[in-house]
Amino acid sequence: MRNYRNYITVLLLSALLCSCGEYQRVQKSDDYNYKFEFAKRAYEEKKYVQAATILKDCVTVFKGSEKAEESLYLLGMSNYENKDYLSSGSYFKTYYTRYPKGKFAEDARFYCGYGYYLDSPDPQLDQSGTIQAIEELQAFLDYFPRSDKVSIAQNAI
């Protein structure tokens, strides 16, 4: 029983070290398609910091290509999931400005405003962030009045 537990521990540590090694290889790689696939997998595995770091490189390189839209959206979502709402809002705003009819436009508008809402300060502090959240959420409601996220946006406002 004890050997079995030691075996499991060694196996888990090996897997952890291999995944760290892969991340380092990806960061040094010049193959941006490989980086993009790794970033998507990291995002799916909830490794948002790794995904965001890799996607920052990909967004610049993929600008004007068919992967540009998805990489920019995933960069915004990685920052959002990592609770970096100001950065995510900036990426989402860039997304819906570049791709107003893109396949992630609705989510980008929503998460931009909702992220600013989540980042809003206490009432006794400067409310410029709150005003920005209200403006973004209202724009979301104006653009997507039939969205399934309408009630969430209305409650936040």
Residue ranges and their predicted role:
Residues 2-4, 16-157:
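Acidic, polar-rich low-complexity tracts and alpha-helical solenoid repeat scaffolds
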Residues 9-16:
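Bacterial N-terminal signal peptides
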